[in-house]
Amino acid sequence: MTIALGKFTKDQNDLFDIMDDWLRRDRFVFVGWSGLLLFPCAYFAVGGWFTGTTFVTSWYTHGLASSYLEGCNFLTAAVSTPANSLAHSLLLLWGPEAQGDLTRWCQLGGLWTFVALHGAFGLIGFMLRQFELARSVQLRPYNAIAFSGPIAVFVSVFLIYPLGQSGWFFAPSFGVAAIFRFILFFQGFHNWTLNPFHMMGVAGVLGAALLCAIHGATVENTLFEDGDGANTFRAFNPTQAEETYSMVTANRFWSQIFGVAFSNKRWLHFFMLFVPVTGLWMSALGVVGLALNLRAYDFVSQEIRAAEDPEFETFYTKNILLNEGIRAWMATQDQPHENLIFPEEVLPRGNAL
């Protein structure tokens, strides 16, 4: 029996190796394999949004003006969702709705699906970029894991929620005032502020802001080695090996303030990661529930008592009446194609309004 010993050599001109060498080359802006997804999708999403807010009307989908060309400003311009009659169509430019006509495609709301889908894949590409770079420089992938929070929120709000409803029409349009209108819609039709998943999301985001402020201030407060620079940002070499702040001093300070303090830097920073990301994940789960029209808290006993006793009212019952007012106004304004006419008995009543 003959045993051949040797090293298998690949063809030096292998296409994969050539692409890998070019994509992962050290340059000012890293490209990488993830860049093949990130850069085109981000370019099309941002470009589609600028195009829509500049030129494209929402008259045919919402009966609204939504572009700079029509007189809107940065806060009121938007790329609006397609009409409710188009349901969940992808609205491809070459599809049966637009039939290759770019003007008709814009009028039907094709830019919204274009921006939403390219935006989602662009965000995923950015997360993959963080994975790829972390692996290249031998870091842990916690940055990419943390970025899954914003991705979960974007996908749940802009894609999963309208998929659970009758069409893309019920997703948020891409604009500042349009997002505010969507928030009011969520409150009126889903009582979103009383949803425990929303509460966890608020606690996560605001708690993270508090932790960030406390952490930054504490590190600044416990600096023990000043440099020659004019300010903090110029005083230290970013590649210095030794720390220049005191964890022991910080621990002593917060132990006196609260009675407890972080004694371990890993646990401290993991907690700062855990709080906002978990909050975002929880709020995304809540939106998925709303896509299925799941209800959260309904304090029916208070509603019944408020209906029977004119002198009994709580902040909850007042909010329920406000929600009814939002629904009564929004349903007729936002869905004129439904020809909704509300009888007097279902319109808002009582002293809450």
UniProtKB/Swiss-Prot annotation:
Top EC class of this enzyme: oxidoreductase
Catalyses which reaction(s): 2 a plastoquinone + 4 hnu + 2 H2O = 2 a plastoquinol + O2
Annotated positions binding chlorophyll a PD2: 198
Stored Pfam families: Photo_RC (PF00124)
EC number(s) given by UniProt: 1.10.3.9
GO terms, molecular function: chlorophyll binding; electron transporter, transferring electrons within the cyclic electron transport pathway of photosynthesis activity; iron ion binding; oxygen evolving activity
PROSITE patterns named in the record: REACTION_CENTER
Details of cofactor binding: The D1/D2 heterodimer binds P680, chlorophylls that are the primary electron donor of PSII, and subsequent electron acceptors. It shares a non-heme iron and each subunit binds pheophytin, quinone, additional chlorophylls, carotenoids and lipids. There is also a Cl(-1) ion associated with D1 and D2, which is required for oxygen evolution. The PSII complex binds additional chlorophylls, carotenoids and specific lipids.
CDD domains (alphabetical): Photosystem-II_D2
Annotated binding of a plastoquinone, by residue: 215, 262
Residues annotated to bind chlorophyll a ChlzD2: 118
Binding site for pheophytin a: 130, 143
GO cellular component labels: chloroplast thylakoid membrane; photosystem II
Entry binding sites for Fe cation: 215, 269
Residue ranges the record marks as coiled coil: none
Quaternary structure (record): PSII is composed of 1 copy each of membrane proteins PsbA, PsbB, PsbC, PsbD, PsbE, PsbF, PsbH, PsbI, PsbJ, PsbK, PsbL, PsbM, PsbT, PsbX, PsbY, PsbZ, Psb30/Ycf12, at least 3 peripheral proteins of the oxygen-evolving complex and a large number of cofactors. It forms dimeric complexes.
Family: Belongs to the reaction center PufL/M/PsbA/D family.
PANTHER family recorded: PHOTOSYSTEM II D2 PROTEIN (PTHR33149:SF12), PHOTOSYSTEM II PROTEIN D1 (PTHR33149)
Protein name: Photosystem II D2 protein
Upper taxonomic lineage: Eukaryota, Viridiplantae, Streptophyta, Embryophyta, Tracheophyta
